[in-house]
């Protein structure tokens, strides 16, 4: 069986567990195809209780060591004591930190959060989306953040997202524990990836976040308590919107969802 060559991939997510929940399948897929993969996490510090779990999750996905921006979580002050919350941190500073990671790793593709903050609209998700948009553009401009290393321009930026038609079983479960459910129109999705062959790796990465799995109101906790068949239906497809470069007129991605079952991002 020939494994298609896939581009290098850098995930940028707000919290430990976002990487496995939102893009664990494509990270595992790209790694299995021999591509370089890595993840930058915006909140929680190196000495926090969740960083060892993040390390285990990244190991399960083949995504290397944890790379941290080091900011505090908007809803959990123990994430990075003494550090500003991500939502309060100077935007220029946060962008500069991410630019340094992009230039150091030199990814072909960056994938991060969408503009609505995924299903729950977490403010850290929204802020990470804003930081990622700016950092991907700035990383390719030599006159910006010269201290962050030689410029590097990723070829594309994708946002992990949830289309209205894909919320299905998950929506009522989140509403049942008092969480918001925010989805985008199906037409906003440009790529849907069937990650079934890598679902076991993705699930192992989710389970690595042991503290979240133990919390019944968290998404990992909700998934862990579902029948296996229902859980598999939720985690085996990942949806993305290509943000840059914008689809050209007449590009197939403008016509709605493009399935890349074997090609990843």
Descriptions of predicted regions:
Residues 1-106, 137-138, 239-244, 249-250:
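Active-site rim/loop-helix segments in enzyme catalytic domains that contact anionic ligands
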Residues 1-8, 81-82, 89-265:
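Metal-dependent de-N-acetylase/amidase catalytic core
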């Amino acid at each position: 069986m020939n494994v298609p060559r896939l581009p290098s991939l850098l995930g940028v997510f707000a919290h430990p567990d976002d990487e496995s929940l939102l893009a664990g399948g494509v990270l595992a897929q790209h790694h299995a195809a021999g591509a370089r993969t890595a993840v930058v996490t915006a909140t929680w510090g190196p000495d926090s209780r969740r960083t060892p779990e993040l390390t285990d999750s990244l190991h399960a996905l083949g995504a290397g060591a944890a790379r941290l921006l080091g900011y505090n979580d908007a809803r959990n002050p123990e994430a990075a004591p003494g550090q500003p919350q991500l939502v309060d941190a100077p935007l220029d500073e946060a962008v500069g930190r991410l630019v340094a990671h992009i230039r150091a790793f030199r990814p072909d593709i960056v994938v991060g959060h969408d503009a609505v903050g995924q299903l729950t609209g977490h403010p850290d998700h929204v802020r990470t989306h804003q930081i990622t948009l700016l950092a991907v553009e700035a990383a390719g401009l030599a006159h910006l953040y010269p201290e962050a290393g030689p410029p590097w321009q990723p070829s594309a930026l994708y946002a992990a997202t949830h289309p209205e038609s894909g919320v299905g079983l998950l929506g009522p479960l989140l509403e049942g524990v008092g969480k918001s459910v925010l989805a985008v129109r199906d037409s906003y999705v440009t790529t849907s990836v069937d990650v079934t062959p890598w679902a076991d790796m993705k699930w192992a990465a989710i389970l690595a976040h042991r503290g979240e799995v133990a919390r019944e109101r968290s998404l990992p906790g909700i998934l862990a308590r579902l029948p296996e068949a229902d859980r598999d239906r939720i985690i085996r497809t990942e949806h993305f919107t290509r943000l840059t470069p914008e689809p050209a007129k007449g590009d197939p991605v403008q016509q709605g969802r493009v399935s890349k079952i074997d090609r990843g991002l």
